[in-house]
Amino acid sequence: MFGKKKKRVEISAPSNFEHRVHTGFDQHEQKFTGLPRQWQSLIEESARRPKPLIDPACITSIQPGAPKTIVRGSKGAKDGALTLLLDEFENMSVTRSNSLRRESPPPPARAHQENGMLEERAAPARMAPDKAGSRARATGHSEAGSGSGDRRRVGPEKRPKSSRDGPGGPQEASRDKRPLSGPDVSTPQPGSLTSGTKLAAGRPFNTYPRADTDHPPRGAQGEPHTMAPNGPSATGLAAPQSSSSSRPPTRARGAPSPGVLGPHASEPQLAPPARALAAPAVPPAPGPPGPRSPQREPQRVSHEQFRAALQLVVDPGDPRSYLDNFIKIGEGSTGIVCIATVRSSGKLVAVKKMDLRKQQRRELLFNEVVIMRDYRHENVVEMYNSYLVGDELWVVMEFLEGGALTDIVTHTRMNEEQIAAVCLAVLQALAVLHAQGVIHRDIKSDSILLTHDGRVKLSDFGFCAQVSKEVPRRKSLVGTPYWMAPELISRLPYGPEVDIWSLGVMVIEMVDGEPPYFNEPPLKAMKMIRDNLPPRLKNLHKASPSLKGFLDRLLVRDPAQRATAAELLKHPFLTKAGPPASIVPLMRQHRTR
């Protein structure tokens, strides 16, 4: 009855304790310092939306700034082995912007300017990819993105500030974590996701002509990818073997081996598809490797030369002479976004600041200026001016107080009147852009910004491409993983149809709150997009027949059968579109949460 009390177990203090980690907060930089590498991607205030992937054809060795969120692999997987790629994925770095270079990236071997757009012609010899950064999480904006990584819901819900913060309103620091662009250290080639044994036969887009109308993909060491006659690259998608027997098709694609360059070695890579397809008729013959050197070692464009070229398309002067009170509201895939006040009128504007020395592909900065300047439309964000301030490109544009559509799709539920209103505005902008040969390549909710009265505007033109009669298709891997079209992932030549697929994914986003496969790592999601049937709505029972029919016209695997923007503007579903004011209640609902 009066038994002894059990003796309380005493736990000693830790022995041999060492203080190895000291974390602090830099008030000037407004960021944590000394964080363990594993924590950096969890606690940074920067956005966690997927960023867009950028074609890895000219990734060079870099020294990134603060880790961001675009995923790049350190090397391409050999023989398309899924195991190798997934092992490599464990060691990828994660950056949330276009890698924020401390040095300028390699210049394009041959560049052209058409309708104000500058695009890389061919990939220069590559340097070793960046090895810095933390382990890649399955995230990917966007970039991306942007890239990139993933927005899988781990820990507190953090949806990354979209690389598309653009001129939108301030984004919360804490948002659902979106996988990461599309986008942003060597981009993994999503095609190498599968074992190199098969590519499902009968896929309509797989019969696409393999003309090399964009710069050819190259291996991590600057070596041309081995191509199957009608299929993707060996490091891309599922070439059955990597033996020398597959080399001739490689040369047919415009990436000849050293011995078969011949007199056309110096021609631009935008030769018409007919020439590229006719190449196999010439049997491969051994030859001296000498003629290859000019293509492998193009003359580098210095930072000063690039800056001088950019100076030709921007406005003279310094915006700080008439702008005050710069306040950072977000971080995008290529730089930061601030709001500023016009001294004379007190009007708020958005200013996107992009450091020339911290870009993965500098030439894409021309898109930021040229597209918004030359293709003005009521559903495209209006650009006021652009300037070179030191080594930064500043783009001054309208400030959209409503923020990004991402906030609405994440935290509210849209009805079909509101979904149709967004689709109508986006399609009106795309119809104009596509008619001019401009492909956006990063359509998603992060790229859609809203005015205070509910008007919808398309933004983020930094990853655009131009097609024309001379260059009818593109082949760069650019976009945000979950929104990418199957043919783009498969590295097949593509055109404006990829924007239509991405819009279809965005419709699913507006209905379900997230894109398909969003709980999967980006590489796995890209494999599923490439190999599976078109994704379906989770809440299919909530969709009307007209919405289902509209979605069926967007998400068609065969790009030739996919509807165009002009055709979709006549679809019955868009007759449901409400006025811009119908979007306002959603913005209010989001603000009151």
Swiss-Prot record:
UniProt cross-references to Pfam families, sorted A to Z: PBD, Pkinase
Post-translational modification: Autophosphorylated on serine residues when activated by CDC42/p21. Phosphorylated on tyrosine residues upon stimulation of FGFR2. Methylated by SETD6. Polyubiquitinated, leading to its proteasomal degradation.
Biased composition, class Polar residues, residue ranges: 184-197
Coiled-coil features, chain-numbered ranges: none
Biased composition (Low complexity): 238-258, 267-280
Residue span, Protein kinase domain: 323-574
Region feature Linker, mapped onto this chain: 25-322
Chain ranges of the CRIB domain: 11-24
Residue numbers of Phosphothreonine PTMs: 187, 207
Keyword ATP-binding: yes
Molecular function per GO: ATP binding; protein kinase activity; protein serine kinase activity; protein serine/threonine kinase activity
Signal peptide start and end residues: none
Reaction catalysed by this enzyme: L-seryl-[protein] + ATP = O-phospho-L-seryl-[protein] + ADP + H(+); L-threonyl-[protein] + ATP = O-phospho-L-threonyl-[protein] + ADP + H(+)
Catalytic center residues: 442
CDD domains the UniProt entry points to: CRIB_PAK_like
Keywords: Apoptosis, ATP-binding, Cell cycle, Cytoplasm, Kinase, Methylation, Nucleotide-binding, Phosphoprotein, Serine/threonine-protein kinase, Transferase, Ubl conjugation
GO cellular component: cytoplasm
Main localization of the protein described in the UniProt heading: cytoplasm
Residues modified to Phosphoserine: 41, 104, 148, 181, 195, 257, 266, 293, 476
Observed phenotype of the null mutant: Mice die at embryonic day 11.5 probably due to a defect in the fetal heart. They show strong defects in neuronal development and axonal outgrowth. Spinal cord motor neurons and interneurons failed to differentiate and migrate to their proper position. Nervous system-specific conditional PAK4 deletion mice display growth retardation and die prematurely.
Residues that span the membrane, as ranges: none
Subunit structure: Interacts tightly with GTP-bound but not GDP-bound CDC42/p21 and weakly with RAC1. Interacts with FGFR2 and GRB2. Interacts with INKA1. Interacts with SH3RF2. Interacts with RHOU and PAXI; the PAK4-RHOU complex protects RHOU from ubiquitination and acts as a scaffold to suppport paxillin/PAXI phosphorylation.
Annotated function: Serine/threonine protein kinase that plays a role in a variety of different signaling pathways including cytoskeleton regulation, cell migration, growth, proliferation or cell survival. Activation by various effectors including growth factor receptors or active CDC42 and RAC1 results in a conformational change and a subsequent autophosphorylation on several serine and/or threonine residues. Phosphorylates and inactivates the protein phosphatase SSH1, leading to increased inhibitory phosphorylation of the actin binding/depolymerizing factor cofilin.
Protein name from the UniProt record: Serine/threonine-protein kinase PAK 4
Species the sequence originates in: Mus musculus (Mouse)
The organism's taxonomic lineage, starting at the top: Eukaryota, Metazoa, Chordata, Craniata, Vertebrata
